[in-house]
Amino acid sequence: VPERHGNKMDNCIFCKIIKGELPSRKVYEDEYTLSFMDIAKDVDGHILVIPKEHCKNILDCNYEALRHTIDTVKKVSNHLTENCGYDGVDVLNANDESAGQTVYHLHMHIIPRRYNDGLGEVGEWPSFPGAKYEIEEIHKQVTMIK
């Protein structure tokens, strides 16, 4: 079981992705953050945004890392709505086990939304029926890395 507290986690899957030890489908990257396609296949276009500095969650994260993470969430969300045909996004985050956090590295989920997308009524939290398209196809549509 990985250490769930503090600022170091040698076994952190997201730290391994940042270091290039594990593959990812990058959507956006800068000096402080990385965003990439979620491999869960729960809904098309599901993107994760993480700080490159390891922190457990919002409760553990320093202000600068959190600010950079939120800045990237905004950039990616704007890209999805302005360039990829989505009407809006849901931004989801869980902090600690009781809230459903399963990977103990701060991460924000961006779920692209369209009217009548079948993920729930307008104003409701989305339900995730499963992805319709292959992740590679969606990745080509949403990536900001050229």
What do these predicted ranges mean?
Residues 2-146:
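HIT superfamily nucleotide-processing domains
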